[in-house]
From Swiss-Prot:
This is 4-diphosphocytidyl-2-C-methyl-D-erythritol kinase. The lineage of its organism: Bacteria, Bacillati, Actinomycetota, Actinomycetes, Micrococcales. GO terms for molecular function: 4-(cytidine 5'-diphospho)-2-C-methyl-D-erythritol kinase activity; ATP binding. It comes from Paenarthrobacter aurescens (strain TC1). One of its GO terms (biological process) is isopentenyl diphosphate biosynthetic process, methylerythritol 4-phosphate pathway. ATP binds at residues 109-119.
């Protein structure tokens, strides 16, 4: 008689991110842009529960516990999904992979500029590594993560990091002091490629030569290390912001409202449309989030830095 199959579930959470700084170089011949960015992992997490299945193959579903309103949102559940791709890569690396079902709990906005899909992929890498006893080191997982997308290695790493190249060359930054933010979510997404194309168009129309970014402003890292939101508020930068606002002009109003109601500064997070408002402290963040919510916005107080992908449970069923 064959050995009886016992299903096992490994649950992993991985954080979304805010780009505290994002400088974007000119369009390269390969179609990419070089960037210099400071990533901050924040306390808004995706979760992936990877369950071994007796039948081979990879299946994906979205958990009913997801806090996002996903009506009308097209999330592919096949090989186009980053979590699916991550599981497929791990299956190739593992000696005895089983089938696997991935249940994703969505909390980070889809196409919101916070790396939600990348967090799903990072969580899946870690979950499948544990599920199939692959024994890969964090460094090996990070190498696989880079194959999946520029933001995936950071969600695996977490904390604060400087990203160069296309964002994939990561250097951890020793900045552990808590910074408090209010995230304002939109009820629509912005395509990252569309935002970059819009930026290229704006720059072409201006005829200004854009230098390649080689590093980030050291003042940003100093402010993060010291936990100094006042200084940080003066040096926030996002080269994609004007492109995002060109595509969604209402984002400017949201930033203005946040700053008028007490935020030290506001910016588009990554390619948007999520807005990140920097608060003086956790109390200020909570008050601001509550006020914006009363005004009809979908707002949430978060903090960072937080750790990267972590196993939160491992259960034999």
């Amino acid at each position: 008689m064959g050995e009886r199959f016992h299903a096992r579930t490994v649950r992993v959470k991985a954080p979304g991110k805010v780009n505290v700084s994002l400088s974007v170089g000119p369009l390269r011949p390969d179609g990419y842009h070089s960037v210099a960015s400071v990533y901050l992992a924040v306390s808004l997490y995706e979760e992936v529960a990877a369950t071994s299945t007796e039948a081979p193959g990879i299946t994906v579903s979205i958990s009913p516990d997801s806090t996002l309103d996903l009506d009308g949102v097209d999330i592919p559940l096949d090989q186009r999904n980053l979590a699916y791709k991550a599981a497929a890569i791990m299956a190739e690396m593992s000696e005895k992979p089983t089938g696997v079902h991935l249940e994703i709990t969505k909390r980070v906005p889809v196409a919101g500029g916070m790396g939600g899909g990348s967090a799903d992929a990072a969580a899946t890498l870690l979950a499948c590594d544990a599920l199939w006893n692959s024994g890969l080191s964090r460094e090996e997982l990070a190498h696989l993560a880079a194959e999946l997308g520029a933001d995936v290695p950071f969600s695996l790493l977490g904390g604060t990091a400087v990203g160069l190249g296309v964002g994939d060359k990561l250097s951890p930054a020793l900045a552990k002091a808590q910074m408090d933010w209010v995230l304002v979510f939109a009820d629509y997404g912005l395509s990252t490629p569309d935002v970059f194309r819009t930026l290229d168009g704006l720059r072409d129309s201006e005829g200004v030569e854009i230098p390649e970014p080689v590093d980030v402003d050291p003042t940003i890292l100093q402010a993060l290390r010291k936990g100094d939101p006042e200084t940080l508020s003066r040096v926030l930068i996002n080269d994609l912001q004007r492109a995002s606002i060109t595509l969604a002009p209402q984002l400017r109003d949201t930033i203005g409202l946040g700053e008028a109601r007490g935020a030290l500064a506001g910016m588009v997070s990554g390619s948007g449309p999520t807005i990140a408002l920097l608060a003086r402290d956790s109390v200020s963040a909570s008050v601001l989030a509550e006020e914006l919510t009363h005004r009809g916005h979908n707002a949430l107080a978060v903090h960072g830095p937080v750790p990267g992908a972590r196993i939160i449970s491992d259960t034999l069923l």
